[in-house]
Amino acid sequence: MGKQGPCYHCGVTSTPLWRNGPPEKPVLCNACGSRWRTKGSLVNYTPLHARAEGDETEIEDHRTQTVMIKGMSLNKKIPKRKPYQENFTVKRANLEFHTGFKRKALDEEASNRSSSGSVVSNSESCAQSNAWDSTFPCKRRTCVGRPKAASSVEKLTKDLYTILQEQQSSCLSGTSEEDLLFENETPMLLGHGSVLMRDPHSGAREEESEASSLLVESSKSSSVHSVKFGGKAMKQEQVKRSKSQVLGRHSSLLCSIDLKDVFNFDEFIENFTEEEQQKLMKLLPQVDSVDRPDSLRSMFESSQFKENLSLFQQLVADGVFETNSSYAKLEDIKTLAKLALSDPNKSHLLESYYMLKRREIEDCVTTTSRVSSLSPSNNNSLVTIERPCESLNQNFSETRGVMRSPKEVMKIRSKHTEENLENSVSSFKPVSCGGPLVFSYEDNDISDQDLLLDVPSNGSFPQAELLNMI
């Protein structure tokens, strides 16, 4: 039967293993039995589980006194580590003392092992190791971070990032990553799926650039423009420029083709969307917009519509809409562009056209044009032309209405002199028995949103389409 407690030395009743002891204490606990085997004596020994607070203090003080060597206490508290530089100032004599002292302690430990045949206890070995570590200056590396050698992948990444930064800094400061630049040199698209044939003449490109720079003044379109995401803005600018180039030169292909093949009822129904048709129908009088589609078909087939198309081709062929001529004024060109879409009997288009042709022939002459009407019932309008040498009154029998204008001053350059002339072809308010046509030209700028306020019946849609092109 195994041994049973309690321990004859400390009085513990439970232990993992009961051990043999000296004859006066035959049964010992695990701790006391281990002490007896290693040291051979139980004098002044109390295991940790049996110590009281007072006994622990006494044993600790006693152990401190036994470790005193040459008046030097080894149980000092571990001092705070001083800066790294102070570790190099330790005197050589102190270093030799600690080295000899440690060697002596190791010799004593070896003798104890040989005499008792076992190792020293855990508590004493820990106390001794702490004592040596606390007094002997240990050499540690500094905490200064050393640069780590970069790998080849990191070097390549850094070089690429540097190149990217240089490229971004070299770019213009006003541009963004989402802006794209397009140069529109040869626009071919006229709109609604139709493609315009180009002029084969060699000088066509120069004429196009001059005409487009002046006719499209309201939209301020240029050959190089910024477009975000290549959206609808670029397409609209191309269409505007193409239309202005078609009208802005006397050699335009509009003069040689049959416009009735382009402006007809079938093309209107086939090529225009429902939204575009509704937008153009707002420009028509109520007579043409109520009974659809018969009213539209009769409008396209009317003789008045065909007459307007032929007159428009004649004006384009004569170069009326070219703004690079020296005798023409920009406001007059814009006015003619609008009048070409109205009834020639109402809009005084012929008078304005003849007036421009006269300026081309006459040089060094100051001309003041005034067109007025005596009353709405009169069928004739009076045009007065004053010259330095003579005065001439000319009556036009085919014009009716009232035409008024504020005085505007324009400089005409001739071969020898530059003189001022007053022009009065900027505001028209014609009235006739054919319909209340009220057309007021107040702004000098023509935009694509200009609407034809009143047009004759059975001849409105193509006129509105031509107005949109201008």
Swiss-Prot record:
One of its GO terms (cellular component) is nucleus. Keywords: DNA-binding, Metal-binding, Nucleus, Transcription, Transcription regulation, Zinc, Zinc-finger. InterPro entries: ASX_DEUBAD_dom, DEUBAD_dom, GATA26/27, Znf_GATA, Znf_NHR/GATA. A zinc finger (GATA-type) spans 1-55. Pfam families: ASXH, GATA. Belongs to the type IV zinc-finger family. Class D subfamily. This is GATA transcription factor 27. It comes from Arabidopsis thaliana.
